Amino acid sequence: MFVSDFRKEFYEVVQSQRVLLFVASDVDALCACKILQALFQCDHVQYTLVPVSGWQELETAFLEHKEQFHYFILINCGANVDLLDILQPDEDTIFFVCDTHRPVNVVNVYNDTQIKLLIKQDDDLEVPAYEDIFRDEEEDEEHSGNDSDGSEPSEKRTRLEEEIVEQTMRRRQRREWEARRRDILFDYEQYEYHGTSSAMVMFELAWMLSKDLNDMLWWAIVGLTDQWVQDKITQMKYVTDVGVLQRHVSRHNHRNEDEENTLSVDCTRISFEYDLRLVLYQHWSLHDSLCNTSYTAARFKLWSVHGQKRLQEFLADMGLPLKQVKQKFQAMDISLKENLREMIEESANKFGMKDMRVQTFSIHFGFKHKFLASDVVFATMSLMESPEKDGSGTDHFIQALDSLSRSNLDKLYHGLELAKKQLRATQQTIASCLCTNLVISQGPFLYCSLMEGTPDVMLFSRPASLSLLSKHLLKSFVCSTKNRRCKLLPLVMAAPLSMEHGTVTVVGIPPETDSSDRKNFFGRAFEKAAESTSSRMLHNHFDLSVIELKAEDRSKFLDALISLLS
């Protein structure tokens, strides 16, 4: 059931209990977790934190802890499946679910006792009505008894005939109801998409409790920015939510201009920015940022000689010396940096890039450290998905979580360096895929497979990294192809996962169009294709459009997917 009063029905309930937090491995979930941890610390709530990267880890962790806890909080996992069916909990177990995955499973919506959904109902949820999908068994058993009073045989016969007609009618009505139910559920469940950021939901709770701090507001901003960076929400949804957070930023960071000089070394200041759509440019060189931002790399077609030439023309149009552009942004001449945003935007317009600036936020820690929200997203994501062998997935999760605190800026800077490697590898892989024609049309969708032995292939074995690569590859392919039909197709991409087990990670990405509603139909399609071919598939990831597949089943799985979507 949906929780309408978060304070009374959620926070005041868990405040006096020991609770277990299951947190998914994505940046928005980490930010929501940080806000909740700060609230729990404030009120001395006892909790245990368990990171989970997929359904298997969630099931294992729940079995391990279910005897010690009655209250479980799930962040960015659990809403889009029948949770009680998967976890088989005791009847006194309560789950509070704060999750962006949509659609919300109907059993979770209509369970009043054990499932409590911490989800904003002003999101466009479109949940089917209870009577359209659930039917009481008593209805079907009614009138099934046959009264044997002392009536005349002719009366009994007439009544029996009436009952037979009535039962036939009821059976037909039930068949019609079941057919209608299947249609309703198919329409409701066929597309996967994302709702309001969980970090924003948790920040609103903190605000309701009058315990919202600037740090919490920053985490909410990073959570929303994570959704935008990963194309999980539409541009309109992003701009709307930026507007909501901007009001809180004004409230928390309201300063008179003459107060600027009195800022202390340890202050934290958040600002609304209309900044450049260039990744990590303030921590990199402008040239590296232009080459490794998917928006500019795709528009310039930087994988080609002609594209490189266009980039040089772009820099010449701005009048920026190559020496300045190729050195660290911090070392550029101050006179050039002053009007840099306007110069880049003006030249970008001439080169057909109308969206070079974007609404975002930045944070200052004291005088020295400044980060854009997207900088923090890329750094945190890279720490979490790090291919470094010096720690487990849990270690990487904790490192990523720690990097969100201002007391651990060294970890954040380390994350920025990892992010640069990941972004370079992404653009190099895209160039390789396009130059060797690895993106092929399979009819109803485009398909690309990274082979074992491809440079940096292990960087893309993790779901978030592969999803981001796929989205950037599709953007670049749409800019490079002259085939109009191919521009409108979705993309399926595969990358090696484990040589030992002979498995691949497969992701499905919806078509790249300006009007895209970011809804993804591949989750259900993958399920049906695997069922019809008995392919050995594991739906372990919380995003249904990401699966693990046995490499030897790949060709029959793809054939089934082609016939299903044709």
Swiss-Prot record:
Tissue expression as described in the entry: Widely expressed, highest levels are found in adult testis and thymus and in fetal liver.
Its keywords, alphabetically, are: Cell cycle, Chromosome, Disease variant, DNA replication, Dwarfism, Nucleus, Phosphoprotein
Mutating R157C has which effect?
In MGORS7; decreased protein level
Where does it mainly reside? nucleus
Q: Which domain of life is it from?
A: Eukaryota
According to its UniProt record, where is this protein located? Nucleus; Chromosome
Q: Which Pfam family, any one, appears in the UniProt record?
A: CDC45
Q: Which GO BP terms apply?
A: DNA replication checkpoint signaling; DNA replication initiation; double-strand break repair via break-induced replication; mitotic DNA replication preinitiation complex assembly
Q: Which residues carry this modification: Phosphoserine?
A: S144, S148
- Which Gene Ontology terms cover its molecular function? chromatin binding; DNA replication origin binding; single-stranded DNA binding
Basic and acidic residues bias spans: 153-162
Give the recorded effect for S264Y. In MGORS7; uncertain significance
Which of the residues bear the PTM Phosphotyrosine?
Y130
GO CC entries: centrosome; ciliary basal body; CMG complex; DNA replication preinitiation complex; nucleoplasm; nucleus
Task: Read off the PANTHER family from this record.
Answer: CDC45-RELATED PROTEIN, CELL DIVISION CONTROL PROTEIN 45 HOMOLOG
Q: How does it assemble?
A: Component of the CMG helicase complex, a hexameric ring of related MCM2-7 subunits stabilized by CDC45 and the tetrameric GINS complex. Associated with ORC2. Interacts with HELB.
Q: Which family does it belong to?
A: Belongs to the CDC45 family.
What is the recorded name of this protein?
Answer: Cell division control protein 45 homolog
Q: Which organism is it from?
A: Homo sapiens (Human)
Provide the gene name from the record: CDC45
